[in-house]
Amino acid sequence: MEVCLPNGHQIVDLINNAFEGRVSIYSAQEGWDKTISAQPDMMVCGGAVVCMHCLGVVGSLQRKLKHLPHHRCNQQIRHQDYVDVQFADRVTAHWKRGMLSFVAQMHAMMNDVSPEDLDRVRTEGGSLVELNWLQVDPNSMFRSIHSSWTDPLQVVDDLDTKLDQYWTALNLMIDSSDLVPNFMMRDPSHAFNGVRLEGDARQTQFSRTFDSRSSLEWGVMVYDYSELEHDPSKGRAYRKELVTPARDFGHFGLSHYSRATTPILGKMPAVFSGMLTGNCKMYPFIKGTAKLKTVRKLVDSVNHAWGVEKIRYALGPGGMTGWYDRTMQQAPIVLTPAALTMFSDTTKFGDLDYPVMIGDPMILG
């Protein structure tokens, strides 16, 4: 399972896309380069060399640093300073069992897809497989609002191993078939870059439709591709629903939260960084004025190159400033059994009004 770090890759991809790969990036494994696959450590921004872990200035562009210098940085905090975000065992167990039921069934359905059906969806769009919530394990908390953390748990041997195997296999199936699931977005920027637009509509002219329950609070974006805009001048419309941490799954920090690999089960984040093991590491926040100034430069340059609307769609409300506030300035909080009292009584674990699907949203003609 991935270690919980601020998503440097996401920001590097964003900047590289905006500047067409002309931004110099540094990694310990590969040194300075314009295209890097390893964990990024430094990048050039606004005449300065910036640490990708804390967005602090570590030198000037002319200096061309050969390694990431030591500075007050989240990446260089001692191991004993890490904070464990620990989830109560029963909560983790419920999540895992519900998720296993879901991914195992979706995996089985994908296995039964014929090449003819796959070709049809690729050319005509639409849904390839659908899983109705009623098919999920009836003992799962995701089935009904009446389920609770204290409901009996089904015993599953090697639960972690099975969940990891099914989850990995399902991801490989989706990737190899070049399909789009409506229950996760591996990279939020794919809402633009991974979906083809009709006509000559510019990506920055994306039309959007919002669910009436949405708010400006940041949360998980669930994209439903079933509603499409056919006007070529407007591009494609999405119905978006926001799942907010305070309202839907308790008040705890989101700097450990990975939007990029998060499937949603009935408005609950079923799997995210560290979730399969029940805990993840979070770095304490260290604030610095140089870092804040650098962020402003970064925001201005990327907004200018990519457009505010596209940035906002890729990184959520608040754009890059909001992303920075959420990932870099989030105080570590431990979720304990006592903290479960913050879970709302009205949380609905399986009350989605549409099934989860895997398919291609593109419709020709």
Swiss-Prot record:
GO cellular component: viral outer capsid
Record flagged with keyword RNA-binding: yes
Alphabetic keyword roster: Capsid protein, Host-virus interaction, Inhibition of host innate immune response by virus, Inhibition of host interferon signaling pathway by virus, Inhibition of host PKR by virus, Interferon antiviral system evasion, Metal-binding, Outer capsid protein, RNA-binding, Transcription, Transcription regulation, Translation regulation, Viral immunoevasion, Virion, Zinc, Zinc-finger
Subcellular location(s) of the protein: Virion
One GO biological process term: symbiont-mediated suppression of host PKR/eIFalpha signaling
Zinc fingers (CCHC-type) by residue: 51-73
Coiled-coil residue spans: none
Post-translational modification: Cleaved during virus the endosomal proteolytic disassembly of the outer capsid.
Molecular function terms, GO-annotated: protein serine/threonine kinase inhibitor activity; RNA binding; structural molecule activity; zinc ion binding
InterPro entries, alphabetized: Reo_capsid_sigma3 (IPR000153), Reovirus_capsid_sigma-3_dom_sf (IPR023634)
Gene3D superfamilies xref list: Outer-capsid protein sigma 3, large lobe, Outer-capsid protein sigma 3, small lobe
One Pfam family hit: Reovirus_cap
Self-association state and partner proteins as the record states: Heterohexamer of three sigma-3 and three Mu-1 proteins. The RNA-binding form is probably a homodimer.
Family membership: Belongs to the orthoreovirus sigma-3 protein family.
Role noted for this protein: Stimulates translation by blocking the activation of the dsRNA-dependent protein kinase EIF2AK2/PKR, thereby inhibiting the host interferon response. Sigma3 prevents the activation of EIF2AK2 by competing with the kinase for dsRNA-binding.
Protein name: Outer capsid protein sigma-3
Protein source organism: Reovirus type 1 (strain Lang) (T1L)
